[in-house]
């Protein structure tokens, strides 16, 4: 009886110790599929795959940023009246990625543009854009100057 317990214990340990690798491989496979869909401009399908990754790993900046970007491009491809339904959700996704890595220039530039283009009523506005501009300056003086030119052109 002790031998059976030992065998079961060893078997379960080997099964659980190997479980990390397939999960990581699954994430990489899902990411490759999503990236491929994104490159082919199938933004809604890519968003669905990125969403799975974000739900599994909510603190991963890359997945959150790709999720926000693909959703944003999907929303941008919609007719104006349909865009209205999705704007707040799009902004929320970008803000989630921003909160994970505030010093990333790409997410800062994306949010700056979104806040400048989207009316305050929908979650945008100059006040939020100015906050992002200040954050960009704190990360990089050169990028801050470029972003300020963009900010002033709006």
Predicted features and spans:
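Sec-dependent N-terminal signal peptides
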Residues: 4-14
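N-terminal leader/linker segments that initiate helical-solenoid repeat arrays
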Residues: 15-50, 54-56, 61-66
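Short coil turns that delineate tetratricopeptide repeat
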Residues: 24, 58, 102-103, 140-141
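Canonical positions in the second alpha-helix
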Residues: 53, 96-97, 135-136
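TPR alpha-solenoid repeat register
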Residues: 63, 107, 145-146
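Short coil/turn linking the two alpha-helices of tandem helical-hairpin repeats
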Residues: 68, 73-82, 113-123, 153-154
């Amino acid at each position: 009886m002790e031998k059976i317990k030992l065998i079961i214990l060893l078997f379960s340990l080997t099964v659980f110790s190997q479980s990390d690798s397939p999960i990581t491989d699954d994430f990489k496979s899902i990411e490759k599929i999503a990236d491929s869909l994104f490159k082919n401009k199938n933004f809604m399908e890519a968003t669905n795959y990125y969403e799975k990754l974000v739900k599994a790993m909510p603190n991963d900046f890359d997945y959150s940023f790709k999720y926000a970007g693909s959703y944003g491009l999907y929303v941008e491809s919609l007719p104006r009246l349909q865009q209205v339904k999705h704007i707040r959700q799009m902004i929320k996704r970008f803000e989630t990625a921003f909160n994970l890595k505030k010093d990333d220039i790409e997410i800062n530039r994306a949010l700056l543009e979104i806040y400048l283009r989207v009316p305050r009523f929908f979650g945008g506005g100059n006040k939020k854009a100015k906050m992002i501009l200040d954050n960009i300056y704190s990360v990089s003086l050169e990028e801050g100057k470029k972003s300020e030119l963009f900010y002033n052109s709006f």
